[in-house]
């Protein structure tokens, strides 16, 4: 695995060795501190001129330093318009800066801009972007080519010079806990399914106990007793036993109702008897991206000691087509008592979530439930890979989620729910069917889930296009993005902590 850079914060000082990184605004503006760190204003101007560098957000330029100062390289990083920078922008700046460190073991970032004071949380966001950019998943590479993309062989020591290093350091303690959560989610999604089955995933979740998270794991026997016929119907085609993991973080007074997050955890999805095409099926190791995000979120909340009571529940199964597998036409009874006709065994995620959602609502009676799932290809057709689909029965919760997405760059787009769509999942033989056909596929899937949350405020995030295989950016370079951890941490931080 990649080595995380060691990051510290200090007052402004001239860099003594390694890489000197300075910020430049759109149009070429820079602070006096940047000029000092680069060896003079003319040097910055010259590097920008010969590189065609304009200071656009996330763009970089560099020059080898040949003086006896001890600095090996000067890097300019564009920040765009300083007055318009948000959380996601600082992550991009940090990621872009880290990408230019190369093999250097030391780097100094001078965090100063003209006529602008950079706050501690902005410095922490930049540092978070550096950590996330440093991430690689190379656990199974026996020969690693570190020169392939210029990333360092060793963990870089990075000093960030900022006006208020004490505040930045405190903000970074929170940001680093969030980084831990994102990286855990990425690791889980990247892990191959022959290594990470339901049992192994549950064991990874149990490691959160050392952070103070209470963990409970239900096996097949316990789920049968609870009547979870929908989840168990999916699992019956695999020799690997299912698990339901309950994670509890108590960071507020015990009488406060918890917030709840539920994740789809299909560790590998062949489609079952309604088997998928072979091409691209290898990506279905990531069909547990929702469960990975919920696990990563619980790690982040516990790591930063969030002042909230939070529940994370993940349903872990493997969808396989053996002789005991669920068939199209089967009818299963969910924990809620509602019956479901299985039209398509490849619409399995909603069956897993049906029981997980009802269990969460019935046992914990939370303030709200948010579920995450790589649920439908239809949402990718509608929104591509830059927004996750948002469905909700509560406008206030939907607005809060949308705003958190805009702030973090983990963007959402709300799609409709309605009685017309709900009628499409009615069945002639059961209370409902698990697939209504091609039209409005992501909407009818959401309507299905809505039948299992009662009157509780609820939102469904369809992350099929964003949790895995989404386009690389300045701070996410691997197949798994860790989507959802930063989004939901921000939601909790802004609205639900005491």
Swiss-Prot record:
Binding-site list for Mn(2+) 2: 264, 269, 287, 348
Sample GO molecular function, one term: manganese ion binding
Gene3D superfamilies named in the record: Leucine Aminopeptidase, subunit E, domain 1, Zn peptidases
Subcellular location: Cytoplasm
Cofactor binding summary note: Binds 2 manganese ions per subunit.
Required cofactor names: Mn(2+)
Cysteine pairings via disulfide bonds: none
Domain of life of the source: Bacteria
Function: Presumably involved in the processing and regular turnover of intracellular proteins. Catalyzes the removal of unsubstituted N-terminal amino acids from various peptides.
Name of the protein in its database record: Probable cytosol aminopeptidase
Source organism (scientific name): Brucella anthropi (strain ATCC 49188 / DSM 6882 / CCUG 24695 / JCM 21032 / LMG 3331 / NBRC 15819 / NCTC 12168 / Alc 37) (Ochrobactrum anthropi)
Organismal lineage: Bacteria, Pseudomonadati, Pseudomonadota, Alphaproteobacteria, Hyphomicrobiales
